[in-house]
Amino acid sequence: MGLSRDDTIGGMRKLTVSDYQALAEFRYQIRRFLHFSERAVQAAGLERGQYQLMLAIKGMPEGVRPRIRELANRMQIQHHSTVELINRLESGGYVRRERAQDDRREVLLALTPKGERVLEELALHHHEELRSAAPGLVAALRRLMPEKGAKSRG
């Protein structure tokens, strides 16, 4: 049975009340985790973006160097905003700039021992919170992403 013109928007099926509830629940679950994260990061004396940048440096994909361009992309922020975060982290003793061994023109970012300690503590707390929040997040995602072949909610 095809969808009438009233059942689609731009060729996509209109959302049902159940779809909106699933989206709202997913956003709620994400927001709960982010609220936890903001409090934990603030208690450690950092800003949310600073923690994210440190995590991005430590968690760069294999073969990708921690350059400003890559970090800005990973964080989805502008280059100048990334530089500002790096400057504040460097002033606080959390990160340092290094020259690449194979290309001395290239500047890479690295965590200092202080940055490593703070990141490890925060990441452990975040990992534990995610373990606790995972059932709610997974359930919300399942509501949003019905298995193939399953009838859509109505």
Where are these regions (language model features)?
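N-terminal helix-turn-helix DNA-binding core of bacterial DNA-binding proteins
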Residues: 35-78
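Short, structured helix-loop boundary elements
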Residues: 20-23, 47, 68, 127, ...
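Pre-recognition alpha-helix immediately N-terminal to the DNA-recognition helix
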Residues: 25, 32, 52-56, 117
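Short, hydrophobic-biased segments on the C-terminal half of alpha helices
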Residues: 68, 86-87
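Charged, amphipathic alpha-helical coiled-coil/dimerization segments
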Residues: 9-10, 87-145
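N-terminal leader segment of winged-helix/HTH proteins
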Residues: 1-44, 92, 148-154
